[in-house]
Amino acid sequence: MSAEFEELSAIDFLLFMDNVDSLDLIRSEYYIIEQNRKICEVFDDEPDNKGCRQLLHRFLCCMKRYPRADFIDSYDAYDRQQKYICISDPKAENYDKFWELAWCREVNTIVKISQTKEEESCQYWSSREESEIECGGFRIKTLMVIKRPRFIATLLLLSDQKNREREIWHYHYTASPTDNNPDDPFIFLSFVCSLNDTFTISKKKQLAEWKPGAVLVHCNDGSSFSAVYCILDICVTQFKYTGALSVANAFRKITQRKHNCLNYDADDYSFCYQAIHMYVLGELGLSQKYLDERELTR
C-alpha cells in the first residue's frame, strides 16, 4: 500500500504521455493512490495505533493555537530541507494570526494564488513601496515591488513585538481565471518554475550551514491549487537534481497524512501531469513556447 511509484526519466515520461491511453492511466493512478490512502486511514483508526492518535492530538493543538485558520498542514519539499505550509486565504479579522503563523514557522516565502480580481482578494500587506501596516503587534513594511507578466513579487520586512526583523518574499500569482476561463497548465507552470529558479539561485549564494525557511502557500479555491503548486514544485526540483521525476510520488507526499486538509480531485491530478509534460518538453528543448514563456517571466 505504501510502495512508491517508479521514477521516470525524461524520455520515459514523454513516452508515457504519448500513449493514447495516458489520460485513462493517469486517472486510474489517481484512484489507486486515493484508495490506498483510505485503506491506510482505516488501518490507522485501529485501537492499537496510538501513534496516529498522538499525531491527531498534536494537529488539534495546532488548530487551537490558530483557531481561525481553515486548515494548517506542512509538507516536505523534495530535498526534505524546505517545508510547504498550506492554509486557506486569511480573512481580515485573521491577519494577526496569519502573521503570527508566518513568524513562528520561520516563513521566508509566501505564495498567494488568487482566483479573484485583485481588489476582491485579501490584502494583508501593502502593495505600495515604503508603506507599512500593523497587524496584532506585527509590522509589515513593503520594501520593493516587482511586477511580472504572470505575478507580482514583493519584498516585505516583518517585525515582531520585540523589533526583531525578517525579510519575506511575497509572490502573488495574477494569471488565474476570473471569468470561468479554463486554467492553463502552461501559464501556471511558468509561475512555479520562476519561483523554483529564484530559490535555487538563492540557495547557491548561501553558506553551507544555511537552511531555507518555510514556504507558505494559500489560495481561495478550496486549496486545490495549493496542492497543485506543491506537487509541481516538488517535481521540478527533483528533475533538476536527478533528471527523473514522479508525479505520483509527489502527490502521495502531500496527501499521505491522514488529517491533511488539501482539497483535490482527479482533474487536479491530470492538470499536474499536463504541466509537467510541458516542463519536460521545454527542458529538452522541444517546446519553443516553453522557452519563450520562461524568458518572459524571468
Residue ranges and their predicted role:
Residues 1-298:
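Cys-based phosphatases of the PTP/DUSP/CDC25 superfamily and their flanking regulatory architecture
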